[in-house]
Structures are given as C-alpha cells and as structure tokens.
Amino acid sequence: MKRFLIAAILTVALPLGTAAAREAPSTSSGHTAILAPLALAQRDQQNLAAARPDARNLYDLTRRLKLHSLAAINPYVRASAPNYAVGRVDTFWVAQATSGYFSLKAKLLLKTPHAYWYVQENMGIPRARLLAALRISAHVFETHVYPTDHAAFGREWTPGVDHDPRITVLCANLPGVGGYYSAEDLYPRSVNPFSNQRKMLYVNITAFALGTPDFDSTIAHELQHMIHWYQHERDDTWINEGSSVLAQVLTGYTPDGQDQAFAADPGTQLDDFCYGAPECSENAAYAHYGAGFLWMYYLYQQYGGDRAMRAVLADGSLSGIALFDDVLARLGSRDRARDAFRKWVIANLVDAPGLDSGAYGYRPTYQGCCVHAAVTASSSSYPFTRHARVNQFATNYVALKPGGTSTLHLQFRGDPTVRIVPNTPLQGGMEWWSNRGDEMDSTLTRALDLSHVRRATLQYDIWYAVEKDFDYGYVEVSTDGGRTWYAAPGRYTTNADPNGANYGHGYTGISVKKAGNHNGWLHESIDLSPYAGRRILVRFEHITDDAFNLSGLTLDNIRVPEIGFADGPGTSGWQMHGWVRVANLLPTHWLVQLVLYTRQGVQVRQMPLSASADGQATLTGLGHDVQRVVVAISPTAPQTTIPSSYTLTVR
C-alpha cells in the first residue's frame, strides 16, 4: 500500500532474586515435544535474530519472475534531464485510497530550483489566486522545508529514474487521502506499469489548500518518505511514518493531534502500523502515527538530534526494534532499544523533563506539546485484581489510589511466551514462517529430482495473512538453476494485478477468509507434471511493498509423494533467506515499572521478574507521603502483533 497521509519516607520492597524457569531437559534428537514452551520460544528468538530477509529488488523480481530474462533492466528512462517548460500538460497515474489507479491531466504552472509544481486541470480555482498560493508554498518549500528535511534525514535519490534533479509535486483532487508518496514512481514502467517515472509527491489540495501551513506540512511529511526510501529502503512503516510526522515538527508545524491520539490509547503497539484495512479505524491509524512520532521525537531529543536521525536512516541492514539497538550503540549510548523504550513509557505518562536528567519527559518545541498518557484502569479498593491483555511494545497504566490501607502488596504474573503468528502448527509442533516486514523479499528454496517420474505434485498446507492486492506469496519453479522462475497457479492463488505488484499467481489476503480453510490452514496441491523427467528448483517466496504488512505466510506438511519426499522437522536441504523454522513462540520479555507520585516528586522503580514472568513488590506510605502509584505494564516481544496476557493482584 502507498504511504497515504490520513489528517518521603516511602519504601518499595522488591525481591532481588529471580527464580529460574523450569524446563524439561533437552536431548540431541531434535524432537521439539520434549522442550518446554519457554525453551522453544528462546530458540525461535535466536533463529529469528539470525534470519535476515533480503530487501525487495524490483528490477531482479521483474527480470526473473515477469520477463523470464537474464538481461539487466536499465534503471533510467532517459539519459539527460528533461528541463520541462512551464505550461506543459502531462498525464499522471494516481493511486486510489484502497486499491487500483486512475489517470488525470495536470499543467506545470511553476518551476523552482528543486521542484516542478503541477496542478490538476479544471480545479475551478481562479488562475491568479492559484498562482499566488502556489508561489507561497513553493517559496516555503525551497527556503525551509527542503533544507530542513535534508539536514535531519539526508537527501533523496537524485537525479533519479528520469535523470532530473527536480521533484514533481502534483496538486490535485485525491479522494480519501491528504497526500502520499509512492516508491513505484522511481522505476521504469517495465517494472511497474503505473509508474510515473519521476520523483513525485502528491497533495490533495481539496483537503490542504495551497499556500497554507497544512499544505506545507504535508510536503514536509511526504518529502521525508522520499528521502527515507533512498536512505533506508527496508525500514518498517511505523519508523518511516514516525519520521515523517517528526519532519512536520522540525519544519515548524504540529503533529496534527496524532500525539494526543496515541496518548489517549497507549495500548497501541509501537512496532506495528495500520491504515486502510477495514478493521483499522481512523482513530487507531492516528494513534499509530502518534506512537511512531513520539518514539522518533524522543530519540531525536534524547540521543543526538539530526545526528540520531541520520544514524537511523544510515543503518540499511536492520529494521524494527532491532534497528535501535544498533543505532544507539553507534551513537555511543549505553542504552539499547528496550532501555530507551522503558524510559519512553514513563515519559509518555509523566512528561517531566526535569526528572532523571530529562529522561522522563519532552522539551516542548511545538504548539500543544506534549502528552500525558491515559490511565488504563484504576482502583482505590483492595484487594484488587486485573486480568488483561496488552499489545507488544505498548503499555497498560494501572493507577493505585489511597483506599483504606497504606501498605499494598503487588503480585504480577504474565504470559512468559507469545505466539509469532495467530495459528497452530499442524504437525510436530513446527512450521515454516516467511518472516514479515516492509520492502521484504524472503525465499525458501529446494532442489527436487523429478527425472525418474512421469507426473508429480507439490503438496503442502499453507496459512497466510498478507496485505490484499499489495503483498503476495508465491510457489515458483526454476528449470535453469534459479536464474529465472515461474510462479505456479494453485487452488488459492490469483493472477489479478490491480496495483502492478503480482508477479504471476500469488497468495494475497487472509486465508482464514477462504472457503475450505481449517483454522486458517488451506491444503494446496501444485501440479509439477510439466516438469517431470527433469531436475528443478522449487521456491516459496514472500514479497511485500513499501508500506504496511501483516503476519506473513506459514507452511507445513510439504511433500512430493511421487518421489517419496516429505519435509522433516529440520532444515536440511533448504536454502533459507528470511524464512525460519519455528515452534511459533517468542519470550514475552515483560517490563513492569512503578511510578510513585510522592510529596518530594515522582520516583520510578523497576519490578524484577523471574524468567517465567512472575514478580512482586510491597509499597508503603500510600495516602501519606505517596499520593498514588501507577503500574506501567509493557510486553516487549518483537516481530509479533499478538497481545500478551497478565494478572496484577493488589492486596
């Protein structure tokens, strides 16, 4: 999907020791049934950390899957800059908010050192007023937005696919969106038929009028996306969108209330994003924008300003939460991602920049800054028990108020593990997972010898949650040693291609919505008889676009009965780039923090937890020196969007 823009004496007794998790002893047999869930989760975590999916390379994908050619694709559509003249009219492809494209004509009304300014024809705006407003925004862009975004994030690809250093800004009626940037425009039409073959930013001037701060803020937002694509193509959407809202603030504008949307819903998962999906409301989308922004804003203020942002974009090999471990190390900080997240959780609650050398607050730099996260639940009556679920890298804030006793005993128990994807492996407790991410290309490849059979079928069970019409999974065959591939049709694949992203026959959408599924699993059979009598390569491939992704694909029971092949519990014979053999478990890694509001100020304490996610604390002085206590509860399992459950008991 395109990157669309929507609008005193207090004592805290904490146990110092932690109990070791009990695990069944392992053996060298490789059978997973003898391992306790936590041990399986730890193994999955290690394997996932080692798995590095490739970045999506549209030239390579087009060559080997669409053109079936060994010839390289020229990334340029012209040899020199076109230097377009004011007054020309061009036809542009424009993405619709849900899926598909339409075309429109627009006239070039203004040319500045770094941009062409096109306006859709027949907008009904008097020419003199249109030009005056256009010149205002063009001046702001050249003198403020462009240099500010460059200082913080770097530069875009220049001269680009058309050898033109200028960016095209299309001002038009874009139903359902405020503006967007599409990386597909930076490729020739042989790669994507809907490419405009130039660097482009799109702004809906029926929503954000030319010559206004709203328009200029949108340009700052979308320009960051263009820069981000060139500097760190494979970054996750939540980081990219957070950076774009930060770009708005750095150029003097506001985050459009998205910070407050997150503050109202701090249970929003930081390392996830949603927009456009039926289950994603506008408020939920705004909260995701706000989470990403506040994280990037916090990093910007705490760890080095522009230098910190440059470090984020310079690390092209990593994305997600893992990226920030590396970034903070390279910035010379002792903190790592979970340290920064722990402090950020408290900053969002108390916003006290004078506390702990500024670690628990924001320095206000925009109108309306900053936030005080909403309390999720509260009690002044004890005993009190809360059973709840909370998203990964999100927080429940539970307030404990005075109520009949000054001493409280807290006991926490959380799920020690969480699933990676919302399914259950069918056989042996293990399944193949494609991994997940934006701009991702993960492959699972194996050689098959069909030279002694006249017919063959590739059978497997598949479960998938893939962004419909934008991301796809494939089963492919190669007869030339992997130089070119053919995406084979299956019972549940489609060759429909509304967005130029389907390389043949692909799985897209959600398998649980398909007729005949069993708990989301579908049994698939691919006819390999056309390749009988030959040695071939078979590949499972998952390709995602530059914005938004779901859980991915999982496979089980892979077999070719005619040659006696049945996939075992290990990985022997497979070439894996991004795919991982998993038990579908990760350690949860809970953070439980106690925020004490005392007469002397705010104090923050950590509750130590055992490996099995149990912990306890005793609080004294409530209602005397302590006005109230807030327990901040956050699970931090990466790469999953499944919530974790916990129980907090207070006596």
List the model feature ranges, each with a label:
Residues A7-P15:
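Bacterial N-terminal signal peptides
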Residues R22-G154, T158:
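N-terminal module-boundary/linker segments of secreted carbohydrate-active enzymes
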Residues P188-N196, P213, S217, H232-Y303, ...:
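Acidic/His/Gly-enriched intrinsically disordered linker/tail segments
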Residues L528-F548:
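Extracellular beta-strand ligand-recognition surfaces/modules
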